[in-house]
Design a protein with these regions (language model features):
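Catalytic adenosine-cofactor/nucleotide-binding cores of aminoacyl-tRNA synthetases and other
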Residues: 1-70, 166-193
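Secondary-structure capping and boundary motifs in well-ordered enzyme cores
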Residues: 5-6, 35-46, 71-79, 91-101, ...
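Short, charged/polar, low-complexity loop and linker segments
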Residues: 27-32, 80-88
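Basic, alpha-helical terminal appendages of large translation-related enzymes
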Residues: 28, 88, 93-94, 103-196
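Short, hydrophobic, well-ordered secondary-structure elements
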Residues: 44, 48-58, 99, 103-106, ...
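Conserved, charged catalytic cores of large soluble enzymes
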Residues: 51-86, 110-126
Length: 196
């Protein structure tokens, strides 16, 4: 039933799943097995894990203040590609395509953490590079909060607030295009998508 689906992972996760799997114009089959799989892979291990890791590192290494840093080309390019893909998808009411743009940026940002190894940069006292990495991750999260707002409004708002941003992410398209977040005070939110 709908009630048990909402209880299982929350209303935003169900909304995301239905938009991603079915959209507006398609018939779809719902299974708890598929709902659980998408929740775990894309939300808990994807967006939730990214937000948790990135915000925890900004807290740990920079006292919760987003540093100013140069552009991290690979992550910036991924963010711009995600924005373009998302805009095209939403203009065509392709909600699955919009969700795929979000997942693509989440995947890129999680991979960026692995490759850039902020913990190693901190240990090596490479402050300039660490600042650039943390700033790039914060910018990616701003973009993700804006992109997620139509599909998961409550979770996007929680991420937006954790990023120290005023207002709501659904009014932030310009912020997604040019995320100026340096100097913002971030807090690690309560786990956005708890793992089962």
């Amino acid at each position: 039933s709908l009630d048990s689906a909402v209880v299982r992972h929350g209303p935003d996760a169900l909304r995301y799943f239905l938009m991603r799997e079915v959209g507006f114009s398609n018939d779809g089959d719902f299974s708890f097995e598929r709902f659980d799989a998408v929740y775990e892979s894309e939300l808990a291990n994807g967006l939730g894990n990214l937000a948790s890791r990135a915000l925890a590192m900004i807290e740990k290494y920079r006292g919760g203040i987003v540093p100013s840093g140069g552009e991290a080309e690979s992550l910036e390019a991924a963010g711009e590609r995600a924005l373009m893909a998302y805009a095209v998808a939403m203009d065509g009411t392709d909600l699955k395509g919009a969700a795929e743009a979000i997942v693509a940026l989440v995947t890129e940002a999680n991979g960026y953490i692995t490759v850039s190894a902020p913990w190693a940069l901190a240990k090596a006292n490479d402050d300039a590079r660490l600042d650039a990495v943390l700033a790039a991750l914060a910018r990616a999260l701003v973009r993700l909060a804006v992109l997620a707002a139509p599909l998961m409004p409550a979770k996007a708002a929680a991420l937006w607030t954790a990023l120290g941003q005023a207002g709501t992410p659904d009014a932030g398209w310009e912020r997604a295009q040019a995320p100026a977040i340096a100097g913002a005070r971030v807090v690690k939110p309560e786990n956005l998508f708890p793992r089962e």
